[in-house]
C-alpha cells in the first residue's frame, strides 16, 4: 500500500494522557452500527506504525481482540461493567496499565466510545497510581485533557479506585 493511507488513520477521539506513552480513544473501527472493519484495520495499522505495543480494552465483550492478535498487538481485556461492584476489575486494569507503563510500553486504552467510563478509568488510574494525589483533581485533569465533563458513572469509578497498599501484589 502506498500513499496517504499507507500508515493507516488514527482512531477517533485519540488523545494522549501521558505523551508518547499512554493514550485513549474510542474502540478502533467505531462502535455499534458505525463499526467498520475496514476502518478498524486502518486504525490498527496506524497504532502499529506509531509503536503501540499494548491495547487495553474495558469493553464488556471481547470485540476486536482477535483483530489485535492478527495485528500482533498485545492486549489486555478488563471488562468494566456499567453498574455493580467494579473494584476488582478496576484493580486488575490498573495493575495491567501500570505494569505496561513501567516497562516503557506504549499503551492505548479504549471503550466503545470516549465517554464517562473511559474518563473514569483514566482519572481513577491517575489517582490510584499516585500521579495525581486526589480524586477530584484527577477528575478535573481528565475533564480538561479530554475537553468534556465527566458524569456520575465516571466519578463513581474514580471513587471506586482504591489506592494500593505498599505491599500490594497481583
Regions found by a protein language model. Give the residues of each.
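Cys-dependent protein tyrosine phosphatase-like superfamily
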Residues: 1-108, 121-170
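Glycine-rich nucleophile elbow surrounding the catalytic serine of serine-hydrolase chemistry
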Residues: 115-121
Amino acid at each position: 500500500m502506498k500513499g496517504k493511507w499507507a500508515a493507516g488513520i488514527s482512531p477517533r477521539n485519540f488523545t494522549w494522557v501521558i505523551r508518547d506513552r499512554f493514550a485513549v480513544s474510542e474502540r478502533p473501527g467505531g462502535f455499534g452500527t458505525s463499526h467498520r472493519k475496514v476502518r478498524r484495520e486502518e486504525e490498527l495499522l496506524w497504532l502499529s506504525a506509531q509503536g503501540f505495543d499494548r491495547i487495553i480494552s474495558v469493553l464488556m465483550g471481547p470485540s476486536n481482540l482477535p483483530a489485535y492478535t492478527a495485528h500482533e498487538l498485545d492486549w489486555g481485556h478488563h471488562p468494566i461493567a456499567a453498574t455493580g461492584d467494579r473494584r476488582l476489575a478496576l484493580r486488575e486494569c490498573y495493575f495491567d496499565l501500570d505494569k505496561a507503563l513501567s516497562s516503557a510500553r506504549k499503551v492505548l486504552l479504549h471503550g466503545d466510545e470516549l465517554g464517562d467510563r473511559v474518563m473514569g478509568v483514566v482519572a481513577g488510574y491517575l489517582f490510584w497510581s499516585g500521579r495525581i494525589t486526589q480524586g477530584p483533581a484527577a477528575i478535573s485533569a481528565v475533564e480538561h485533557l479530554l475537553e468534556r465533563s465527566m458524569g456520575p458513572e465516571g466519578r463513581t469509578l474514580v471513587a471506586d479506585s482504591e489506592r494500593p497498599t505498599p505491599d500490594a501484589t497481583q
